[in-house]
A protein has these predicted regions:
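Beta-strand-rich domain onsets/edges
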Residues: 6-17
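A short, amphipathic beta-strand motif
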Residues: 16-24, 51, 89, 101
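Short, ordered, surface-exposed loop/turn motifs in non-cytosolic proteins
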Residues: 16-18, 25-40
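Structured interaction patches on ligand/partner-binding surfaces of diverse proteins
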Residues: 72-87, 94
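Structured extracytoplasmic
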Residues: 96, 100-248, 270-274, 291, ...
Length: 336
């Protein structure tokens, strides 16, 4: 449901403030940190913690509005902006018949691309929620930059079953400083002092919203798993068979209560293209809500396994990162 002012004649040159609120159609309560876009001219932004938003210096006219939130059906509509504008958007929760989920067989990816709703509506809905989680993180990282500190621990694993601590430190990462996914280019040479060293880049959450990633991967529903005692839908993705170079396969888990992403697992395909001595590279990433509906990385655990034992029986390396703090430059929903 949408409520808006009517455009009076002769007001095309006036500029006004467009204010509004996004609420749940079921409860009437404001939905915090929903994404609202006013087109043309205005970029997407988050609502505040009460579901309110504002666009300033809006010329009178007709605009396309898009409203998104994880766990809710997207809303697209048209509004007419006049002298005084008050908007109210009601979003309805996503409903997926879990009993109707068909677990498709794992197979070679020969027809990559986003799932077709006509062929598998449940998969298409869950895929859209996965994409929305990723897109929201992308918006958060780029428009509301933040820094987060991770405690890092590096270890070596040996064929005897022993582990040896190698190094530990605390690293600070900027949310908008990251590698971007390119099909078949997840293994590159490093920069600076690492220019002669091959580096494996495992895609991050924003990459799951990238059309390039969608076009080169197949997606399927792999069933329901229990995480922390709650049901989660598992979506698996496979790199296209046509990709000759190393890329990634993986899985993503979304809670069925609100379709928030909780975990992703990533595996390097064709690891021998990265290094003849490597047999596997994998990582598990878990997320937490820093603010309602807004995810940040909580823990990363990466494992690199050697094809043959090295000196002293070395068979692998692990890297664990744990979140210790997040600092926003500007909180989502705040004006600049």
């Amino acid at each position: 449901m949408v409520a808006a002012a009517v455009l009076p004649a002769g007001l095309e040159a006036q500029r006004v403030i467009v204010r509004g609120v996004v609420v749940s159609a079921e409860t009437g309560e404001g939905i915090p940190y929903a994404v609202v876009v006013l087109r043309p001219q205005f970029s997407q932004r988050f609502t505040d913690d009460a579901g309110r938003f504002a666009f300033v210096e809006v010329a009178a006219g007709t605009y396309q509005v898009s409203v998104r939130q994880v766990g809710y059906r997207p809303l697209d509509t048209t509004v007419a902006v006049g002298t005084v504008v008050g908007l109210r958007f009601e979003l309805r929760r996503v409903a997926v018949e879990l009993a109707a989920i068909t677990v498709s067989a794992d197979a070679v990816c020969t027809e990559p691309g986003p799932p077709d709703p006509a062929r598998d509506s449940a998969l298409a809905i869950v895929f859209d929620q996965l994409r929305e989680n990723a897109a929201r993180y992308h918006l958060l990282a780029d428009q509301y930059p933040f820094r987060y500190r991770m405690v890092r621990r590096l270890t070596q694993e040996f064929s005897s079953g022993d582990s040896r601590f190698v190094h530990g430190d605390t690293i600070e990462i900027r949310s908008n400083d990251r590698w971007r996914y390119r099909p078949g280019r997840v293994v590159t040479y490093g920069r600076g002092s690492l220019s002669q060293v091959k580096v494996v880049h495992l895609p991050e959450l924003p990459d799951l919203a990238d059309p390039n990633f969608h076009r080169t991967h197949c997606f399927r529903l792999a069933g329901l798993d229990s995480l922390d005692g709650r049901p989660h839908a598992r979506v698996e993705f496979r790199a296209a068979a046509a990709l000759d170079e190393a890329d990634v396969d993986g899985s993503a888990w979304l809670d069925t209560a609100g379709y928030r992403l909780r975990r992703i697992a990533i595996r390097l395909t064709r690891p021998e293209r990265a290094d003849q001595e490597i047999s596997a590279v994998s990582a598990i990433v878990t997320f937490r809500e820093e603010l309602p509906f807004l995810l940040v990385v909580e823990r990363i655990f990466a494992l690199t396994t050697r094809r043959r034992p090295g000196a002293g029986g070395l068979v692998g390396r692990t890297e664990e990162q744990r979140l210790v703090g997040v600092e926003f430059r500007r909180r989502p929903g705040e004006s600049r």
